[in-house]
């Protein structure tokens, strides 16, 4: 019986917490907004006939109150292999613009398998560290970004913020 009462109290605890949130300082790791995005096109700097220029990327990002972000993206790499990128990052306005920004993310990239496992550095275990810089433009709830994939490609994405 006591266990059931504790379970009920725990179930209602989030409701009590939100009522007290007005008086407390905001949680710096609270999510401020979400984004969903997809790839529009990829341009390879050294193109080959076998390169995939349509990555079918689907990405989601959470932007926190403290300015940091975290996200995941799933896509096909340049060799038509399914990949995942899990990352954290940050954005900075360009010249105090409300629209233009620079974004830098870093995380783990999975999916570059044989025979292309050596196309990205440090991919010994099938998972490699990655750093992806981007330039973005946002207008109201919409945005577009140009993401630099190492020295190999530039991918243009578009998405929505909510």
Segment roles from a protein language model:
Residues 22-28, 64-66, 89-96, 139-141, ...:
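Outer-membrane beta-barrel proteins
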Residues 50-51, 103-130:
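Outer-membrane beta-barrel translocator/channel fold
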Residues 55, 83-85, 128-132, 153:
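Transmembrane beta-barrel architecture of outer-membrane proteins
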Residues 38, 58-62, 86-92, 104, ...:
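Residues on the lipid-exposed face of transmembrane beta-strands in outer-membrane beta-barrel proteins
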Residues 36-44, 68-77, 133-135, 139-151:
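Transmembrane beta-strand segments that form the barrel wall of outer-membrane beta-barrel proteins
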Residues 1-29:
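Cleavable N-terminal export/targeting peptides
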Residues 21-64, 73-74:
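Short glycine/proline- and aromatic-enriched beta-strand/turn motifs that initiate or cap beta-hairpins
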Residues 30-34, 66-68, 82-84, 98-102, ...:
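Outer-envelope beta-barrel architecture signal
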